[in-house]
Design a protein with these regions (language model features):
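Acidic/His-rich active-site region of diverse nucleotide-sugar glycosyltransferases
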Residues: 1-53, 59, 68
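Hydrophobic alpha-helical membrane-insertion segments
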Residues: 15, 66-67, 91, 111
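Glycine-rich phosphate/pyrophosphate-binding loop
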Residues: 16-27, 33, 158-182
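A cytosolic small-molecule/anion-sensing beta-strand core signal
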Residues: 31, 63, 76
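Conserved short hydrophobic patches within well-ordered secondary structure
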Residues: 53-54, 62, 134
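Short active-site alpha-helical segment characteristic of glycosyltransferases
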Residues: 60-64, 80
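Active-site-adjacent helix/loop segment of glycosyltransferases
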Residues: 72-162, 166-167, 173-177
Length: 182
C-alpha cells in the first residue's frame, strides 16, 4: 500500500482474514523483506538508495518502479514472516527519526508537483498529527530533528528527484489510483 503522505503499509495488516486477499492482484509495491525483483527492474530503476538506510527504502524503490511502468503482483500463496521493527524497536527514537526523515525523502524524490499539490492537505494533516502525537509521547525533538535533517539533504535529494522524474515513463493519472488518499 502507498499512502499520500508517503508512507507504505502492509496489505491487510491489522485486518481479520476473511479471504479478502485470496486472489492474485496488482499492488503498489512489495515490502523489501518480501519482494522478489527481476534483474531488469534493478537495471532500469536502480538499486535501493543507501540514503534511506532502513525504513521506506522499499517505498522509494516501489515508487520509482511505478514511475517507470513496472507492475507488482501480490501472490496470496506466498508466505512471509517479517518483524518490521526488530532492528531498532517500534517507536524507538531511532525508528521515529528514520521513518519520518525518510517519508520526506520519498515525497521530495518521487512526487510530481501536481501529485504533491493534490495530496498537500493529506500530507499537512499527517505532519500535524505526527507533531501532536510524538510531542505527547515526549519524542517531539526527535521528530523535529528528522525533518531538519531531511531538509539538510534537500540539495542531493533534488538532484535525485531530477534524475527520477526525467526517467519516468508513466503519467500521474496511472499512479494516482494506486495511492490511498486518506
Amino acid at each position: 500500500l502507498f499512502h499520500a503522505w508517503s508512507a507504505g503499509g502492509g496489505r491487510g495488516q491489522g485486518e481479520k482474514d476473511v479471504g479478502q486477499y485470496d486472489r492474485e492482484d496488482y499492488v503498489f509495491g512489495a515490502c523489501a523483506g518480501a519482494g522478489i525483483y527481476r534483474r531488469d527492474f534493478f537495471e532500469q530503476v536502480g538499486i535501493f538508495d543507501e540514503d534511506f538506510f532502513i525504513f521506506a527504502e522499499d517505498v522509494d524503490i516501489n515508487m520509482r518502479g511505478q514511475l517507470q511502468g513496472f507492475k507488482c503482483i501480490y501472490l496470496p500463496e506466498a508466505k512471509v514472516y517479517h518483524i518490521g521493527t526488530a532492528t531498532v524497536g517500534l517507536y524507538s527514537d531511532r525508528y521515529i527519526y528514520l521513518c519520518k526523515r525518510n517519508d520526506i525523502f520519498v515525497l521530495i524524490r518521487n512526487f510530481s508537483l501536481q501529485m504533491y499539490f493534490r495530496s498537500l492537505w493529506t500530507i499537512l494533516k499527517h505532519q500535524f498529527n505526527d507533531i501532536k502525537y510524538f510531542t505527547y509521547r515526549g519524542q517531539g525533538i526527535v521528530l523535529f530533528k528528522s525533518k531538519l535533517d531531511a531538509l539538510k539533504m534537500l540539495t542531493p535529494m533534488l538532484f535525485r528527484r531530477f534524475r527520477i522524474q526525467s526517467s519516468r515513463t508513466v503519467s500521474d493519472s496511472k499512479i494516482d489510483p494506486l495511492i490511498i488518499k486518506s
